[in-house]
């Protein structure tokens, strides 16, 4: 008598996708971080989109817009906390995903590794562009945190950091 999960037409699909998945025997929970990265990214995009509908970036009204989101917008408080904690979770999953690849020697497969390094550089470039590249309109915190390693370069570090910042334009707490 055959097992129902292998003979029933609908259950057979679920069985071949989840139970008898054709995967290596050494696969572990470490291999879930790529999927978790996708979930975190989708969460960041959705919550960020809804938060941006109510946020004001002017330094005089930014705090009031955040309190408006938390108090007056339906489930605004949970959107804010999901967005903030989702960003942390995204980077935790990112570092664990790269760490898993390093641990298991995935860098030996150069094509696959380079396909993975490309989105990593894209994430870093997005962070850089979001905080530093709008010359004259950048966040002081973002500019100093992202470019503080540049200022450690001997002789040219300070000038290089100021050039990346766009001169002495870093002055306010928010992007306006």
Swiss-Prot record:
Q: Which Pfam families match?
A: Cytochrome_B (PF00033)
- Which top-rank group of organisms is this from? Eukaryota
UniProt-annotated binding residues for heme b b566: 97
**Transmembrane regions listed in the UniProt entry:** 33-53, 77-98, 113-133
Keywords attached to this entry: Electron transport, Heme, Iron, Membrane, Metal-binding, Mitochondrion, Mitochondrion inner membrane, Respiratory chain, Transmembrane, Transmembrane helix, Transport, Ubiquinone
Q: Where in the cell is it found?
A: Mitochondrion inner membrane
Co-factor binding details: Binds 2 heme b groups non-covalently.
* CC per GO annotation: mitochondrial inner membrane
Q: Biological process GO annotation list?
A: mitochondrial electron transport, ubiquinol to cytochrome c
Q: What topology does it adopt in the membrane? A: Multi-pass membrane protein
Q: Which GO molecular function entries does the Swiss-Prot or TrEMBL record give?
A: metal ion binding; ubiquinol-cytochrome-c reductase activity
Q: Which CDD domains match?
A: Cytochrome_b_N
Q: Per its Swiss-Prot or TrEMBL entry, what cofactor is needed?
A: heme b
Please tell me where heme b b562 binds in this chain: 83
Q: Which family does it belong to?
A: Belongs to the cytochrome b family.
Subunit organization:
The cytochrome bc1 complex contains 11 subunits: 3 respiratory subunits (MT-CYB, CYC1 and UQCRFS1), 2 core proteins (UQCRC1 and UQCRC2) and 6 low-molecular weight proteins (UQCRH/QCR6, UQCRB/QCR7, UQCRQ/QCR8, UQCR10/QCR9, UQCR11/QCR10 and a cleavage product of UQCRFS1). This cytochrome bc1 complex then forms a dimer.
Other remarks on record?
A: Heme 1 (or BL or b562) is low-potential and absorbs at about 562 nm, and heme 2 (or BH or b566) is high-potential and absorbs at about 566 nm.
Function according to Swiss-Prot or TrEMBL: Component of the ubiquinol-cytochrome c reductase complex (complex III or cytochrome b-c1 complex) that is part of the mitochondrial respiratory chain. The b-c1 complex mediates electron transfer from ubiquinol to cytochrome c. Contributes to the generation of a proton gradient across the mitochondrial membrane that is then used for ATP synthesis.
Q: Which PANTHER family match?
A: CYTOCHROME B
Under what name is this protein listed? Cytochrome b
Q: Which organism is it from?
A: Myotis leibii
Read off the lineage from the record. Answer: Eukaryota, Metazoa, Chordata, Craniata, Vertebrata
């Amino acid at each position: 008598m055959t097992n129902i999960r292998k003979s029933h037409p609908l259950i057979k699909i679920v069985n071949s996708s989840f139970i008898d998945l054709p995967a290596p025997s050494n696969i572990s929970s470490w291999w879930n971080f790529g999927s978790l990265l996708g979930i975190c990214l989708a969460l960041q995009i959705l919550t960020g989109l809804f938060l941006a509908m109510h946020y004001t970036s002017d330094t005089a009204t930014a705090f009031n817009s955040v309190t408006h989101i938390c108090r007056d917008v339906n489930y605004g408080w949970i959107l804010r906390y999901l967005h903030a904690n989702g960003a942390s979770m995204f980077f935790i999953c990112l570092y664990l995903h790269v760490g898993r690849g390093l641990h298991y020697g995935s860098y030996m497969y150069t094509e696959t590794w380079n396909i993975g390094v490309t989105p990593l550089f894209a994430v870093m470039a997005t962070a850089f562009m979001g905080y530093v590249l709008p010359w004259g309109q950048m966040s002081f915190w973002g500019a100093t945190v992202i470019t503080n390693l540049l200022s450690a370069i001997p002789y040219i570090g300070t000038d290089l950091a100021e050039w990346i910042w766009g001169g002495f334009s870093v002055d306010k707490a928010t992007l306006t």
